[in-house]
């Protein structure tokens, strides 16, 4: 299970990160805070290990140092804003997050801690970096995500444009380099950024390694990951890439793409084609729900529900019993009818009970977070949910694209409004 955390994030310091510091030098001032040389050195070593594990050739040390320092500065700025606005992550929330990470790696939290320490990580430091990530995630949600909405008209336009382009399920694996232009930049600053971007593009045209060039020059959020944006469907592409990317062949590099943020270069790493119709198995079901309270214990409720089930098996009408006894008032009015249910609509325990039944069968009483149930499956059918699936997917893809664009603008504004003084040696 070694190196279980390579893909989690690069800000997890190895042991020794928080050791006592003698005459530690300040390498950056970030508003009222500072970044210390020891922090920078530890982060650089961690990023070097990650890039080496990915097989990415390393840029010169001073270049990597400046890229890493910029990431530390941006982290400081976001944590400062979170602190000023009262965002906190308590130990209970933190422990739940750690438990999920351990579970995702197939481990208990205790086993996970042992693996971390065997791989050279200090667990208390790891905990605090997870806390920082959760704080920044909450900040992004409040400042960006919650302010993004998607209208019905946007979904309709998205689907119309997808049909015009064809192959709406095509996916693109992209890498990206951004050379930023400051907010309210002068013509000279714009020209300087463009000249730098053209030099970078020329290096790529001459065969330079894209990942190394991205780590060296890119101002994008994924610079230290070699500019890798991962797999994107058309609707997940930034708006300014939509007309460019479909024209590229795998391995192609785009021309310069101008945006308010600066100059972009995109490489198409790989491509995959269309998907298929979305056919799902729907279940028509009805149920009776009983809840325990101060007048009836869990055992008494379970016994009462067993008696109702036996009455149904003996010939009593399910609908009449549901109307008379069920605590789910919404479905009770319809004789317990839940209609046609698609996968994912019900909680897992309820779906598990439905899956185990053939049409006409009635379950034994079972418990969920809502109380005690008996469920009867009436029928099953295959339903083409492609249109509904496409609309839901369109909404998610539009939202993701808008969030990414807003986040980039928000981070740029946060950086431009901050006081940052670099004290690295030239």
UniProtKB/Swiss-Prot annotation:
Signal peptide: 1-19
Pfam entry (one): SurA_N
Record flagged with keyword Ribonucleoprotein: no
GO biological process: Gram-negative-bacterium-type cell outer membrane assembly; protein folding; protein stabilization
SUPFAM superfamilies: FKBP-like, Triger factor/SurA peptide-binding domain-like
All residue ranges annotated as the PpiC domain in the record: 169-270, 280-379
Gene Ontology MF annotations: peptide binding; peptidyl-prolyl cis-trans isomerase activity; unfolded protein binding
Enzyme Commission numbers on file: 5.2.1.8
UniProt keyword list: Chaperone, Isomerase, Periplasm, Repeat, Rotamase, Signal
Keyword hit for Repeat: yes
Location within or outside the cell: Periplasm
Catalytic activity: [protein]-peptidylproline (omega=180) = [protein]-peptidylproline (omega=0)
GO cellular component, one term: outer membrane-bounded periplasmic space
Gene3D superfamilies assigned: 3.10.50.40, Porin chaperone SurA, peptide-binding domain (1.10.4030.10)
General function of this protein: Chaperone involved in the correct folding and assembly of outer membrane proteins. Recognizes specific patterns of aromatic residues and the orientation of their side chains, which are found more frequently in integral outer membrane proteins. May act in both early periplasmic and late outer membrane-associated steps of protein maturation.
UniProt remark on domains: The PPIase activity resides only in the second parvulin domain. The N-terminal region and the C-terminal tail are necessary and sufficient for the chaperone activity of SurA. The PPIase activity is dispensable for SurA to function as a chaperone. The N-terminal region and the C-terminal tail are also required for porin recognition.
Protein name in UniProt: Chaperone SurA
Name of the gene encoding the protein in the UniProt record: surA
